């Protein structure tokens, strides 16, 4: 089976590398000062689009207009709050965003230093047996055509579907079709190693989005709130006008040949509910301390990602991020993030759906699955503040073709072999849109895995044992003969480093 990993390493070399002009400042386009850019929507993708227009497109801030029907910036906390250490597109933009906490540093500097000094840890046991590992490797080699129209349950055994690995992975990436599952494995397999994920100092909104907003405001980008876009006119593959409605008045804005239009779009299905639990109850914190064997208020990363509750009807998963999660959080408070993949189903403790439940009832359901004695659940749940669930939808992309002066951004944009539920994906769509309309020649980063990446993941899935120790006696004899052929080589040293034998 190890040979499969070696072959797969060479197979995925096609993913790409890094070109020299990735590090070059793009040339300023002729007549760029005559351009105006209109971005329809003010979510994270729209903000990043404005950043690329400023930095790489050389547009003036006062020529960039962000238009949205919301009334303020407080609408931006993305669902997927974890960030992996291969978020190349996110890093590319954050390296240019000044920190609002430490003068002279960027947001990328700040996040990097934090995770070097206090890296995320994992408490998950997601090891796979040799049989299940073989299933996973075989799946890696399955062509996209063979997976068309199939669900994950159609290509894996029941044992695999009930494994801790699958529950963990499905909690992170709630996809059911086989192709999307394969995409997430190829793109994010490195997070299975001990330092595959990183975390910001506070929530994504305060650590990433607020600095971006301040960067845009400092460059005089124009925000139009309480303004609804009611119509976009497109003729012969060119956007000619769009209509807005504000304070009951409609206005049509005509676009010239120098104007650019960015349209936020998404395609959705399968609602997911999210709840933020805030507690200062020492009894709950004591239970969490015993369960996790770490103090939730220590300031370190606590759970190392999501913890799925396998037997939950709502398919709950939860995580305790680095505390404090908010800048203004009280010293003795603990914030827990709770997600329900099936909020429409009836709960196991609460006899109603998650969407129908009040905050304290959702908290009670979570405490029930933690194993808290039932005679104490109701009392403890009332001692915690819990927001009612808000819904997010797992996105299914469609192909959107850009026009001569307009481009699509956001989760609804189809990118080959990418998972749309990450911050990195959103930045990628913004970068593509700006670069295509302004014909920027700077290279777009591409992912590339090394053999060390695959061996590191392989080692994580084998657990404390070496790969050789997980094999049958007959297989060990064959593998020992193969190892004799590489004795004394760099490959032998590499295999030892990653616990192959």
What kind of feature is each model-predicted range?
Residues 2-37, 55-61, 467, 476-501:
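Extreme N-terminal leader/targeting segments of oxidoreductases
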Residues 69-92, 173-178, 183-192:
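Glycine-rich active-site loop/strand segments that organize a redox cofactor
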Residues 190-198, 258-260, 265-428, 435-436, ...:
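C-terminal segments that line or cap access tunnels to active or ligand-binding sites in enzymes
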Residues 187-259, 265:
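Helical element adjacent to the flavin cofactor pocket in flavoenzyme catalytic cores
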Residues 54-75:
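Glycine-rich FAD pyrophosphate-binding loop
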């Amino acid at each position: 089976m190890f040979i499969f990993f070696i072959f797969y390493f060479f197979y995925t070399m096609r993913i790409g590398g890094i070109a020299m002009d990735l590090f070059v400042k793009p040339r300023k386009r002729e007549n760029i000062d005559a351009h105006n850019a209109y971005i329809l929507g003010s979510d994270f993708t729209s903000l990043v689009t404005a950043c690329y227009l400023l930095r790489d497109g050389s547009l003036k801030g006062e020529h960039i207009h962000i238009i949205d029907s919301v009334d303020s910036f407080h609408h931006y906390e993305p669902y997927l709050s974890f960030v992996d250490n291969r978020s190349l597109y996110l890093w590319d933009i954050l390296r240019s965003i000044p920190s609002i906490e430490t003068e002279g540093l960027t947001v990328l500097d700040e996040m990097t230093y934090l995770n070097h000094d206090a890296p995320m840890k994992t408490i998950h046991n997601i090891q796979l047996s040799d049989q299940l590992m073989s299933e996973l490797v075989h799946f890696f080699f399955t062509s996209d055509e063979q997976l068309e129209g199939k669900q994950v349950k159609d290509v894996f055994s029941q044992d695999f579907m009930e494994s801790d690995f699958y529950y963990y992975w499905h909690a992170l990436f709630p996809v059911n079709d086989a192709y999307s599952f394969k995409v997430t494995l190829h793109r994010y397999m490195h997070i299975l190693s001990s330092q595959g994920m990183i975390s910001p100092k506070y929530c994504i909104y305060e650590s990433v989005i607020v600095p971006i907003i301040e960067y845009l405001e400092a460059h005089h980008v124009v925000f139009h709130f309480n303004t609804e876009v009611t119509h976009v006119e497109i003729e012969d593959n060119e956007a000619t006008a769009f209509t807005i409605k504000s304070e009951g008045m409609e206005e049509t804005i005509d676009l010239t040949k120098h104007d650019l239009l960015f349209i936020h779009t998404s395609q959705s299905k399968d609602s997911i509910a999210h709840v933020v639990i805030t507690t200062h109850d020492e009894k709950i914190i004591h239970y969490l301390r015993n369960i996790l064997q770490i103090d939730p208020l220590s300031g370190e990363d606590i759970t190392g990602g999501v913890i799925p509750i396998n037997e939950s009807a709502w398919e709950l998963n939860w995580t305790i991020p680095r505390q404090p999660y908010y800048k203004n959080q009280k010293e003795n408070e603990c914030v827990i993030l709770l997600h329900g993949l099936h909020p429409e189903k009836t709960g196991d403790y609460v006899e109603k759906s998650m969407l129908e439940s009040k905050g304290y009832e959702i908290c009670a359901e979570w405490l029930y699955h933690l194993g808290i004695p039932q005679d104490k659940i109701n009392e403890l749940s009332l001692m915690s503040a819990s927001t009612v669930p808000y819904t997010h939808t797992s996105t299914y992309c469609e192909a959107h073709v850009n026009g001569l002066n307009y481009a699509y951004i956001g989760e609804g944009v189809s990118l080959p072999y990418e998972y749309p539920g990450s911050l990195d994906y959103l930045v990628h769509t913004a970068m593509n849109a700006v670069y295509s309309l302004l014909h920027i020649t700077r290279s777009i980063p591409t992912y590339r895995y090394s053999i060390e990446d695959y061996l590191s993941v392989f080692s994580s899935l084998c657990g404390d044992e070496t790969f050789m120790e997980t094999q049958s006696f007959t297989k060990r004899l064959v593998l020992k003969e193969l190892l004799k052929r590489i004795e004394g080589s760099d490959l032998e040293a590499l295999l030892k480093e990653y616990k192959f034998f």
